[in-house]
Amino acid sequence: MVNFDLGQVGEVFRRKDKGAIVSGDNPEEEEDVDASEFEEDEVKPVRTKNRRPKEDAFTQQRLAAINPVLTPRTVLPLYLLIAVVFVIVGGCILAQNSKVDEVTIYYQDCMTNATSSWSDIPSEHWQFVFHKYKTYNTAPQWRFVDDESDDFTKQRGTCQIRFTTPSDMKNNVYLNYVLEKFAANHRRYVLSFSEDQIRGEDASYETVHDATGINCKPLSKNADGKIYYPCGLIANSMFNDTFPLQLTNVGDTSNNYSLTNKGINWESDKKRYKKTKYNYTQIAPPPYWEKMYPDGYNETNIPDIQDWEEFQNWMRPGAFDKITKLIRINKNDTLPAGEYQLDIGLHWPVLEFNGKKGIYLTHGSHLGGRNPFLGIVYLIGGCICAAMALILLTFWLFGGRKIADASSLSWNMK
């Protein structure tokens, strides 16, 4: 058996490695390694869409809340408080309305029923309300003055009306005209106008006729191809009975009560209505304006709708078939008690559709004209709340149970 020493084996290998290095058999050189290659690249966070609300008390619905327990002790006072407030407010409104004086006179058949001399107006044509003279019933009078030079036979001439006010009317004094059975809320009617014309633009026929929604159909141009200005059904049917700028004092003509047609419309409309850019050769008045413009437009008579407040008022259609619109006003002077005369030029026919037209004279109040509706609604609401409080009190006293009565628990009622 050959003796084999492991230590000699290790020596042999060490000599071999050493000889390899000396003989030039160099091992492959290791590639240089850049430490920066092992550094992690900066990773930019990617924002993902998240519809989750913010983490706060409001968006997460963690706000402090009160969940009251409704008991007769809390509900009864609440009903009573609401009843008292509603009754007080309703009473104040009715008291304010009861102090409003007004004169209403209808004159639609003045041309056919009134004579050339003064006569009493039928009782169904007028209504006077004076809070200091509740039984006042002196009938107003009228007479008709014909104008044979006017070829328009449906409505012509002047209707003269006399009425007496037994007490002063404090300013502001408002003179309105009233129309009944005139359906100004018809869909085709309220959409028949041109906003471009109202804003002063010289809109073409295609613009006023073919616009989607609001347009001037069926009154866009006349037989000569001229565009109606202003076009549409609303402008064409404008109320054109004429009213003077004063109430004539019958007893003292030197003390007439002055009126004005300025300040009768909303201030906001002054920014909407502008003077037109049309040339008079491009346009024609609407068909029903024939009495106002018998020879059409010229260089000087094109209406300036920016300052024509009666027209601006008319272009705001009423919501119902009864319309009341302001035509004259006096903001400075009290209307003294006395007999006054109002001369109305007749131009606007109503008998063809069984309508009515009249005047409405009032001084109004801080809450508007004489209308008890709102006050009555408040009183009814207050009475309902009081009745609910009484019913709840009755059930509580005679049909209720003790609060926190242990005998009413289900396991104690077996």
From Swiss-Prot:
Disulfide bonds join C110-C159, C216-C231. Changing C110A: Strongly reduces interaction with DNF1. Mildly resistant to miltefosine. Decreases protein level. Normal protein level. Pfam families: CDC50. It is found in: Cell membrane. It comes from the Eukaryota. Belongs to the CDC50/LEM3 family. This is Phospholipid-transporting ATPase accessory subunit LEM3. It comes from Saccharomyces cerevisiae (strain ATCC 204508 / S288c).
